């Protein structure tokens, strides 16, 4: 894919496109306020992926203070992946990987996060494989996490350079 892929920070004018991709790809949908609020608070970890100038995917994260998902009772800042989606025709081309890596880099560099974590449907094998390939490990399960009652794996990774 290479040179025609551009990962950049979300801008307000991207909102309609990102909401459309979210509706197209995921059953978990959000109000426009939710997107704008996350962008206002954590602009460096709300990213879009452009292919030939058109947005085909996004990632948005929330920066949280809490405890390590990988070590007991270790307080730290966490990068929580709230939502990531890539349009079906553009999947399996490294776009999700590029979004994840850039969001984790920015989380570390801009907000001082030590770990990244996310929830993923237990049946979403392609996503689980992607996260495992990136180095995420399953650290727990949330029962009936999704509105339809499906469980979620909680997966986490230490972001490089953790002191």
Where do the model's predicted regions map?
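Conserved N-terminal entry element of GNAT/NAT acetyltransferase domains
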Residues: 1-12, 161-163
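Conserved hydrophobic/aromatic "anchor" residues
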Residues: 35, 58, 130, 136, ...
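Conserved Rossmann-like nucleotide-binding pocket used by diverse enzymes
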Residues: 6, 80-82, 116
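Conserved glycine-rich acetyl-CoA-binding loop
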Residues: 83-101, 110, 115, 121-129, ...
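C-terminal "cap" of GNAT-fold acetyltransferases
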Residues: 114-117, 121-125, 134, 144-163
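Acetyl-CoA-dependent GNAT
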Residues: 12-89, 100-111, 158-162
